[in-house]
Amino acid sequence: WRPEWAASSPLFNPIRWLNQHTPPDRWPDQNDYDSLAKLQQQVPGIRFVLPENLPDTGEYYETRIHRSGKVPTRANNWHDFFNAAVWLTFPLSKQALNQRHILGQQHSDSRGRGPLRDAATLLDESGIVVAYCDDTLAQLLRQHEWQQLFVARRSQWGRTISAITFGHAIY
């Protein structure tokens, strides 16, 4: 466990608040995550559970969460820590994303993921949310005008446009 993770990069800004609510000397455990979920009070019924404490039902990962509210969360694991962090920071977005997976399953004619679930998985694992209030900047982004967006308009970042890490696999 590295308690200094939160200060090591601005990438962690959206989830940095967790560092003030988790033990400094050890990995957070399922009880810590559940206490934070209750503190957030946005998605009732979500719990973080060790995978070995869940019966093997043969369900997709997302189906289990949708049906039971139990998010499989391995102990002492950065990937699952960051997944829990995103659930705790953006609970309504994660719930909506989980619902997209369920819709994708219902509209798929095979056991494969399909395009809707593929897109949901990409956002969940490696997504960046770009929030903006200046349409010109959004247009520069869409047109891949990187020099204009990132260099000429650098002063706008953090003021009228922001990139927020959402995908837990890229933290």
Residues of each region from the PLM?
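Short loop/turn segments at secondary-structure transitions that flank enzyme active sites
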Residues: L54, L88-L92, V129, Q147
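The feature captures two recurrent sequence modes
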Residues: W1-S68, R159-Y171
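Short, hydrophobic/amphipathic alpha-helical patches that form generic packing surfaces
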Residues: P10-H21, D80-L92, T121-E125
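Hydrophobic alpha-helical segments and helix pairs
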Residues: G69-H107
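Short His-Asn-centered micro-motif
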Residues: L50-P51, A84, Y132-C133
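A contiguous, surface-oriented mixed alpha/beta subdomain in the mid-to-C-terminal portion of proteins
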Residues: L103-Y171
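Non-catalytic, well-ordered alpha-helical scaffold segments
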Residues: E59, N76-A84, R117-A120, D135
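Residues that form generic nucleotide/phosphate-binding pockets
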Residues: H21, L36-L39, R64, A85, ...
